[in-house]
Curated annotation (Swiss-Prot):
Keywords: Electron transport, Flavoprotein, FMN, Transport. Residues 3-145 form the Flavodoxin-like domain. PANTHER family: NITRIC OXIDE SYNTHASE-RELATED (PTHR19384). GO terms for molecular function: flavin adenine dinucleotide binding; FMN binding; oxidoreductase activity. The gene is cinC. The keyword Transmembrane does not apply. Belongs to the flavodoxin family. One of its GO terms (cellular component) is cytosol. It comes from Citrobacter braakii. Pfam families: Flavodoxin_1 (PF00258). Its cofactor is FMN. FMN binds at residues 9-13, 89-120. This is Cindoxin. Involved in the degradation of cineol (eucalyptol). The FMN protein, cindoxin, shuttles electrons between the FAD-containing cindoxin reductase (CinB) and 1,8-cineole 2-endo-monooxygenase (CinA).
Length: 154
């Protein structure tokens, strides 16, 4: 199995979390980490990855950080068939704002609406909690490994 881990960041936290997620998954899964600013939906689909993990921070008024805005706008416009695509979302945000973790929720909604199948729950790291985002990412990645090992119930 192989996973493509994509991140959108302004301050570097999502990138650090993507690296942590990659390290946890690498015990079982071949991983590659890329900035969403350097990725297109077509390249994502052509990667052949069995799992796509998004680590995305909410920025400004609920927008995607970094290259996430352009990436997800292209997904909305082109509407590729994502059936057969498994994805997971690690969101970062600050509950001080009313748009807390909106980018992560929006990512999951877009991917599912195009036919993707979500693995595990969308993570919602809260900067205001004082919890280390990389520790939260590590715990969440272990949950994703467990979800991947559990057969789907139909």
């Amino acid at each position: 199995m192989n996973a493509l881990i994509l991140y959108g960041t302004e301050t570097g936290n999502a990138e650090a979390c993507a690296t942590t997620i990659s390290q946890v998954l690498a015990d079982t899964v071949d991983t590659k980490v890329h900035d969403l600013a350097d990725m297109t939906p077509r390249a994502m689909l052509d990667s052949g990855a069995d799992l796509i993990v998004f680590a995305t921070a909410t920025y400004g008024e609920g927008e995607f950080a970094g290259g996430g805005a352009a990436f997800f706008e292209t997904l909305r416009e082109t509407k590729p068939d994502l059936s057969g695509l498994r994805f997971a979302v690690f969101g970062l945000g600050d509950s001080y704002y009313t748009t807390f973790n909106q980018a992560g929720a929006t990512a999951a909604t877009i991917l599912a609406s195009l036919g993707g199948t979500q693995v595990g729950d969308t993570a919602r790291h809260d900067t205001s909690s004082g919890d280390d985002p990389e520790e939260t990412a590590e715990e969440w990645a272990r949950e994703i490994l467990t979800a991947l090992a559990t057969p789907a119930v139909s």
